[in-house]
Curated annotation (Swiss-Prot):
Keyword Cell division belongs to the record: no
Any one GO CC term of the record: iron-sulfur cluster assembly complex
Protein name: Monothiol glutaredoxin-7
Organism: Saccharomyces cerevisiae (strain ATCC 204508 / S288c) (Baker's yeast)
UniProt-listed PROSITE patterns: GLUTAREDOXIN_2
Record carries keyword Cell membrane: no
PANTHER family referenced in this protein's UniProt entry, alphabetically: GLUTAREDOXIN 2
Family listed: Belongs to the glutaredoxin family. Monothiol subfamily.
Lineage, opening ranks: Eukaryota, Fungi, Dikarya, Ascomycota, Saccharomycotina
Domain Glutaredoxin: 88-191
Amino acid sequence: MAIVINKRNVRVLVITNLLLIVVFFVLRNSNASVNESITTHHPDSLVTFDNSGNAPGTHQSVHDTVNTQDKEAEEVDKNSGDAEFDAAAEYNKIMEQSPMIVFSKTGCPYSKKLKALLTNSYTFSPSYYVVELDRHEHTKELQDQIEKVTGRRTVPNVIIGGTSRGGYTEIAELHKNDELLDSFKKWSDGAFTVKANSQSESA
């Protein structure tokens, strides 16, 4: 059977070829788009990311997610830092060590004189408790709390019954006038006993 080629057949063939060409380009562009959206594997990572930087199952950029997590971590660290040292709790804990507390500093000459006076001239039961503020990890915060509670920031600071009884000058003056022993007994309110040593020396 002979195929008759006429203008109509030619037109049909041309249109068919054009349609095939259009379909070819459409499919080609579609494949290119699919390839662009293929997820990318980042070395040293267990998560794959697409070209927008999104991880599967997430709606925001991984970089944004990391930044958010970093900010949250900083907030946690900040809050943890604020809660690391509670000066009030530390002060109360120190007060539980003995009915008589002496806040001191190792390099302070007046602190040294006071400790020598107490050691050489009196015997306490239970013994008083000495806190060397310059050896404390949070010197400033604790000293601020001491001032807040007792009204006295300087050292030495003798605390009996939760009240500051003075520093070296006040204690030495009472000792010099033979009034310190009676003062200790009054301040103790029975919480501790104290007696003067036989070889008592005035400062």
